[in-house]
From Swiss-Prot:
A lipid is attached at C26 (N-palmitoyl cysteine). One of its GO terms (cellular component) is cell outer membrane. Plays a critical role in the incorporation of lipoproteins in the outer membrane after they are released by the LolA protein. One of its GO terms (biological process) is lipoprotein localization to outer membrane. Monomer. This is Outer-membrane lipoprotein LolB.
Amino acid sequence: MTVYLHDVNRGLGVFLLVVSFLLPGCSSSGGRRASVPVMVDATAQVVEQARQTWLQEHPNWGFHGRAAISQGRDGGSVRVEWEQHGRGYRIVLSAPMSRQSWVLSGSSSGPARLEGVGGWVRVGEVAEQVLFEATGWQVPMGLLPDWVRGRNSGGGDVQLDAEGRPHRVYQRGWQLRFLDWFPSSVGRPVLPRQIEASRGSARIRLIVDQWDELIP
């Protein structure tokens, strides 16, 4: 990705941000077409930088939400309860229709543990692989902690919206779109409300119903 940042009008503090990346095409080759320039003014840049700083300074967080996950013609919906304490996580997934539930826990620097109904347990070094072997779902567990909060980890190609927030992200073969945001509140910046991710035939749509700030 090449990012060109030109000073369009120093007096007005307006900048032209051109993020050169390719969007998925309609062909099977997955070709991309160049994006259009996005105008991001100086005020929006300052606000977004403050938001990114806030995210870095608040590593303990959680949310309640819903997710629709599909792999080709197969898929399902789950309730999601996510708790993140620094690098450690505990995620409860429950599927009301099938009455199944799973608890995925671990750390980004250690093994992952998945517990299911009936007491069975799977343990592995990579959370994404552990979850896939048990459910058949492709979920980028290593990327989600940053994605769900709209945090720029610096590891992908990013297109910003007019507010300077991430709008589309391309990372490790995944395409992510931010569809809606919660407005800022006292002591908390804007946070994603709805995101959608896809890679090949895998699709994930996440809706956050409530954000929680966890006590260290």
